[in-house]
């Protein structure tokens, strides 16, 4: 096996990292108007530089900014699109035994993309990373699925086909903008595909006015329309998530309901799939993964708890997955980010880094890799 020189990498990670105490304190101070936006940004800059250096030091071939400038993994991007309004509601998103902050979005105008603060976030990352800078944004299907037809203005979009067309156009523009900014590794984070694997979530989708049975095909078309003009030198991956807030989850269920459309029909370069618990089901749905250049990133290491996995067990599961996908098409990562929201999961900072270090070590042992050394 050879070390991959293009994304995704044998040892990879989803993106978000636990927020350092300095950032949490600064955000609280900014909310109380005790410091300026510029002062907060300076603290974020400093902590992001530290996180980049730490990722490089443990041997990763990529670095993210940890999503340190975000409150939410998805809303912070969506609220920067034309036609999307962010607002406070009467309840948060319900996870297993806990709710998020009572904030959400609605579509009350025509969807569009014409610049975004996250372009500057990426430029800062690129300027300070000596390895491949990786940017993460939510997938277009996520904007639709979380609240469905009920959150999309009937006046603006009486026909949902027009909504999906505008959404795909907005993502094509976003992809071009990130590419122009120098991004060559972009990940679209997605909860829709995995939520559709849960019968309870499909029932909720129906209550919102959607037909869950038709959504896998609809989301495959939306994805491919968004990726239609993807530059040849840009790797775009997706991450499928069942919910990740304060170490809890929303959905359960194997990939059977969506595997053919997700793995067989969408034009991503790589797929990050959760496989850290029985809630994700078995590897059988991977039979739909095509042979060739695409990569499947096994999320076998949990980001929800601090206990370090047994390396031999992780290797055994990688070997089990090779019944369906060739080893040369597999990579390894945590199942999700460590902090999909600013609150973060319930584990220590050093436990997070120990997991990422272990992933690098396992990748070196399984694929026979040399430790990555960033260029000066």
Question: Language model features by range: what are they?
Answer:
Residues 1-376:
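Domain-level signal for soluble alpha/beta catalytic cores
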């Amino acid at each position: 096996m050879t070390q991959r020189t293009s994304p995704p990498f044998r040892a990879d990670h989803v993106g978000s990292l636990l927020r350092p105490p300095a950032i949490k304190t600064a955000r609280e101070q900014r909310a109380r108007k005790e410091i300026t936006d510029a002062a907060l940004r300076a603290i974020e800059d400093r902590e992001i530089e530290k996180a980049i250096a730490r990722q490089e030091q443990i041997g990763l071939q990529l670095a993210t900014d940890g999503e340190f400038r975000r409150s939410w993994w998805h809303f912070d991007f969506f609220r920067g699109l034309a036609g999307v309004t962010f607002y406070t509601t009467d309840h948060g998103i319900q996870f297993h035994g806990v709710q998020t902050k009572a904030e959400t979005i609605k579509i009350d105008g025509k969807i569009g993309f014409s610049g975004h603060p996250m372009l500057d976030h990426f430029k800062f990352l690129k300027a300070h990373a000596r390895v491949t800078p990786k940017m993460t944004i939510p997938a277009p299907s996520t904007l639709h699925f979380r609240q469905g037809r009920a959150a999309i203005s009937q006046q603006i979009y009486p026909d949902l086909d027009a909504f999906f067309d505008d959404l795909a156009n907005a993502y094509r523009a976003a992809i071009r903008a990130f590419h122009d900014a120098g991004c060559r590794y972009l990940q679209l984070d997605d909860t829709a595909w995995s939520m559709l694997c849960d019968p309870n979530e499909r029932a909720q989708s129906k209550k919102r006015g959607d037909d869950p049975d038709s959504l896998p095909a609809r989301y495959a078309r939306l994805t491919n329309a968004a990726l239609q003009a993807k530059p040849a030198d840009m790797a775009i991956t997706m991450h499928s998530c069942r919910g990740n807030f304060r170490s809890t989850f929303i959905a359960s269920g194997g990939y059977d309901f969506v595997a053919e459309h997700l793995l067989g029909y969408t034009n991503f370069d790589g797929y990050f799939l959760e496989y850290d618990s029985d809630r994700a089901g078995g590897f059988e749905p991977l039979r739909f993964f095509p042979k060739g250049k695409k990569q499947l990133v096994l999320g076998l290491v949990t980001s929800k708890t601090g206990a370090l996995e047994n390396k031999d067990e992780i290797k055994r599961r990688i070997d089990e997955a090779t019944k369906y996908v060739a080893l040369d098409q597999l990579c390894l990562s945590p199942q999700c980010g460590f902090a999909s929201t600013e609150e973060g999961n319930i584990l220590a900072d050093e436990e997070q880094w120990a997991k990422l270090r272990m992933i690098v070590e396992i990748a070196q042992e399984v694929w026979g890799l040399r430790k990555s050394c960033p260029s000066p």
